[in-house]
Amino acid sequence: MQCALYDAGRCRSCQWITQPIPEQLSAKTADLKNLLADFPVEEWCAPVSGPEQGFRNKAKMVVSGSVEKPLLGMLHRDGTPEDLCDCPLYPASFAPVFAALKPFIARAGLTPYNVARKRGELKYILLTESQSDGGMMLRFVLRSDTKLAQLRKALPWLQEQLPQLKVITVNIQPVHMAIMEGETEIYLTEQQALAERFNDVPLWIRPQSFFQTNPAVASQLYATARDWVRQLPVKHMWDLFCGVGGFGLHCATPDMQLTGIEIAPEAIACAKQSAAELGLTRLQFQALDSTQFASAQGEVPELVLVNPPRRGIGKPLCDYLSTMAPRFIIYSSCNAQTMAKDIRELPGYRIERVQLFDMFPHTAHYEVLTLLVKQ
């Protein structure tokens, strides 16, 4: 991938950009095999990759500069701002949005937040695009609601320029820290969720729900999990850390009993909406802590699917899964180091199958799907 920002030394986020994709995949596979070296693996599936540029469906832009000349991008460690509107990881459809946002920031008087001086209002611009219909969700992260009335007043101009903006919100993040968002979300549009579709499964993206940033590879990840589950004798499964329900909604059949658990209520609202659209009445989604939910249940499903954050599922849940002993565990991980650590805490299981998904090209990061079978 050619990147003028990288070539000019202005951005180094894609550390592996000079390596061809096959070399990147080889290095990631070697890393994964090294992490799982202590465990016999029955089957290594070929790694899955997608486009090497224009694949991201989300931009997280730090706003800096002045209200007349805002910069959208990032801050270097020394506080120097860098405009990243030309980043080749973004699809071409993002360019007109960034171009319209800069004059809009001036129109609405949204002074960029100055970290050093602790002054200003506009901290971040968060943009997400749906692959299914090109609709977009735009979030303004502000320090307070001081400029809210001005923003509302100026908004019709922006909506006229960019009719693809289906969901627009303001998030209030009052803390002087590098935290992306606060708890308060104010909707400026009637529509509150972005419609997405992977493999004919309807999914919904709400402002404070996690959603994969590489749709091409994420849809293959979900489809693979579905194919693996269909090969197993499973009538009852749990989907822990389920997010908006991507895995559970793909894996469920009309006669399967499935419970999806996720701590974020926004994500659960999305999952319930999708299940209703699919007419899957035996699916239950609840906003709870996954470990607390699992350890409070009496009935044991045949399959537990886990998709934890980078920290992994942790010893308490590993201990409980070992005691509960479901026949199958599918572990989807964005951090193979913590996954390997967790598998070590599940001594009663063998690794049947492993597949790497290159969700983050040009970096050392990847996703991995692992099928564990009770010995």
From Swiss-Prot:
UniProt: [4Fe-4S] cluster binding residues: 3, 11, 14, 87
Reaction equations catalysed: uridine(747) in 23S rRNA + S-adenosyl-L-methionine = 5-methyluridine(747) in 23S rRNA + S-adenosyl-L-homocysteine + H(+)
A GO MF label: 4 iron, 4 sulfur cluster binding
SUPFAM superfamilies on file: S-adenosyl-L-methionine-dependent methyltransferases
Active site: 334
Keywords from the UniProt entry: 4Fe-4S, Iron, Iron-sulfur, Metal-binding, Methyltransferase, rRNA processing, S-adenosyl-L-methionine, Transferase
PROSITE patterns according to UniProt: SAM_MT_RNA_M5U (PS51687), TRMA_1 (PS01230), TRMA_2 (PS01231)
Class in the EC hierarchy, top level: transferase
InterPro entries named among the record's database cross-references: 23SrRNA_MeTrfase_RlmC, MeTrfase_TrmA_AS, MeTrfase_TrmA_CS, SAM-dependent_MTases_sf, U5_MeTrfase_fam
Residues bound to S-adenosyl-L-methionine: 212, 241, 262, 307
Entries under Gene3D superfamilies matching the protein: 2.40.50.1070, Vaccinia Virus protein VP39 (3.40.50.150)
The enzyme's E.C. designation: 2.1.1.189
The keyword Metal-binding belongs to this UniProt entry's keyword annotation: yes
GO biological process, one term: rRNA base methylation
The protein's role, per its UniProt record: Catalyzes the formation of 5-methyl-uridine at position 747 (m5U747) in 23S rRNA.
Family indicated by similarity: Belongs to the class I-like SAM-binding methyltransferase superfamily. RNA M5U methyltransferase family. RlmC subfamily.
Xref: PANTHER family: RNA M5U METHYLTRANSFERASE, TRNA (URACIL(54)-C(5))-METHYLTRANSFERASE
Name of the protein in its database record: 23S rRNA (uracil(747)-C(5))-methyltransferase RlmC
Gene coding for it: rlmC
